[in-house]
């Protein structure tokens, strides 16, 4: 698995822009805890979080069978749509916190993250998809283009 991660990151690392690194480094340098939450499985997202220096990761956890192999099933609450709110709530509770304590900025490119964008104090649409972009603009949320102009 380590070799697969290395090969994967050789392809991904060049797409991590300087602006994306700045968006991660700035709050970290200010002492904030960085939490990456993704609807993609942990196997894929863990090396990306590590490359960015992100403190914590919430992702889809894949169930493993008795031999350690992935079963193809999801373990626990999927971190997708409203499930992201549930999983972050669990993460906060494990630290003796709740949503009232969270001073959060959340970046997303997907309409599927609308529930989380509506939950946080500072929603940001980053490379938003065609359905998220007009909502973000209508609500006055910042819209970032991390990969240059989007069609």
Where are these regions (language model features)?
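C-terminal cap/substrate-recognition subdomain and adjoining C-terminal extension
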Residues: 2-6, 10-151
């Amino acid at each position: 698995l380590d070799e697969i991660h290395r090969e994967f990151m050789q392809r991904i690392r060049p797409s991590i822009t300087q602006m994306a690194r700045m968006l991660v480094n700035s709050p970290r340098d200010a002492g904030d805890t960085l939490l990456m939450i993704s609807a993609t499985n942990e196997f894929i997202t863990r090396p990306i979080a590590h490359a960015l220096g992100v403190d914590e990761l919430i992702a889809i956890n894949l169930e493993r069978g008795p031999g350690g192999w992935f079963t193809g099933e999801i373990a626990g609450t999927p971190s997708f749509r409203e499930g992201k709110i549930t999983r972050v709530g669990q993460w906060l509770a494990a630290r003796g916190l709740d949503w009232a304590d969270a001073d959060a900025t959340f970046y997303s490119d997907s309409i599927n993250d609308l529930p989380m964008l509506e939950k946080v104090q500072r929603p940001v649409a980053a490379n938003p998809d065609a359905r998220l972009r007009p909502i973000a603009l209508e609500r006055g949320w910042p819209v970032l283009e991390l990969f240059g102009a989007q069609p």
